[in-house]
């Protein structure tokens, strides 16, 4: 009985995700990853020539500046990219 109770407690802790962690989409939005500590933004990177097709997605600490060839879109909520 104690083993069952301990197992339930562990499963509950894992499912509740103690401490806030940001989740960002990977390149294919069906999949996401949990961001490590310190990376509190999600980003989506586009080539300026093809703005509708993201090239890269993930977690980042500071939103990079856009350039003539590359545009970044950053946000700070779960799976916002």
Curated annotation (Swiss-Prot):
Tissue and organ expression note: Expressed by the venom gland.
Keyword terms: Cardiotoxin, Cytolysis, Disulfide bond, Membrane, Secreted, Signal, Target cell membrane, Target membrane, Toxin
Gene3D superfamilies xrefs: CD59
Any one of the GO CC terms: membrane
Disulfide bridge partners, by residue number: 24-42, 35-59, 63-74, 75-80
PROSITE patterns documented for this protein: SNAKE_TOXIN (PS00272)
Family: Belongs to the three-finger toxin family. Short-chain subfamily. Type IA cytotoxin sub-subfamily.
Subcellular location: Secreted; Target cell membrane
Signal peptide annotation: 1-21
MF-aspect GO terms: toxin activity
Pfam families: Toxin_cobra-type
Primary location: secreted
Role summary: Shows cytolytic activity on many different cells by forming pore in lipid membranes. In vivo, increases heart rate or kills the animal by cardiac arrest. In addition, it binds to heparin with high affinity, interacts with Kv channel-interacting protein 1 (KCNIP1) in a calcium-independent manner, and binds to integrin alpha-V/beta-3 (ITGAV/ITGB3) with moderate affinity.
Quaternary structure and interacting proteins, as annotated: Monomer in solution; Homodimer and oligomer in the presence of negatively charged lipids forming a pore with a size ranging between 20 and 30 Angstroms.
A GO biological process held by the record: killing of cells of another organism
Protein name: Cytotoxin 3a
């Amino acid at each position: 009985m104690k083993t069952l109770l301990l197992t339930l407690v562990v499963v509950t802790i894992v499912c509740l995700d103690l401490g806030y962690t940001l989740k960002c989409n990977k390149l294919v939005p069906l999949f996401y990853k949990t961001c490590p500590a310190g990376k509190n933004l999600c980003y989506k990177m586009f080539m300026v020539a093809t703005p509708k097709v993201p090239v890269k997605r993930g977690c980042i600490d500071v939103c990079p500046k856009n350039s003539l060839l590359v545009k970044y879109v950053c946000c700070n909520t779960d799976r916002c990219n």
